[in-house]
């Protein structure tokens, strides 16, 4: 993944994992299926937390709140790996379609003509900005600062919308 999505091949994965190319091909019919499986694996904890938050309220603004909490309460190793894969895929636009759809779905239904909707959108964007800055290595954000950032997002953007 260090060399981009073009270098992410079944052969490369087999060599890195110390297994046969046939073993990888048995599990994954294509490079796309392998990438999808990687995202599903790394996204598992996120989705569980997201679904827990929206279980009783699936409104658009609560889905944004769920995204914020799921991003905040993350597994660092999984997110770091997911960010590495995302960075590799940025070099190959055809793999970005499902990611674009995922982002659109997260903000679907947020009414940005209202103060609450505008705050929800800002909270979402602040969350994504913090994630990208931390996991793409563009800014050193330690665990304490990570907690402070999400406390600020919650108190300045999320909690205000529910008052």
Residues covered by each model-derived region:
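Generic structural signal for hydrophobic core residues of well-folded globular domains
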Residues: 38, 71, 89-90, 130, ...
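Alpha-helical structural segments
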Residues: 2, 16, 33-56, 62-70, ...
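Amphipathic alpha-helical interaction elements
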Residues: 5, 26, 55, 87-91, ...
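Helical hydrophobic small-molecule/effector-binding pocket
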Residues: 52-97
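Hydrophobic/aromatic-rich alpha-helical bundle segments in the mid-to-C-terminal region
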Residues: 93-100, 104-163
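Helix-turn-helix
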Residues: 2-33
């Amino acid at each position: 993944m260090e060399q981009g999505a073009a270098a992410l091949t079944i052969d490369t994965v087999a060599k890195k994992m110390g297994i046969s190319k046939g073993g990888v091909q048995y599990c994954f019919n294509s490079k796309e299926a392998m990438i999808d499986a990687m995202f599903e694996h790394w996204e598992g904890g996120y989705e569980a937390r997201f679904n827990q938050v929206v279980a009783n309220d699936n409104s658009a603004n609560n889905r944004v709140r769920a995204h914020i909490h799921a991003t905040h309460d993350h597994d660092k190793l999984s997110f770091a790996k997911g960010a590495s894969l995302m960075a590799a895929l940025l070099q190959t636009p055809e793999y970005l379609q499902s990611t674009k759809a995922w982002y659109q779905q997260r903000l679907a239904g947020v009414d940005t003509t209202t103060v609450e909707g505008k705050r929800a959108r800002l909270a979402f964007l602040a969350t994504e900005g913090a994630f990208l800055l931390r996991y793409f290595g563009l800014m050193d954000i330690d665990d304490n600062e990570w907690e402070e950032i999400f406390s600020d997002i919650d108190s300045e953007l999320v909690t205000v919308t529910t008052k």
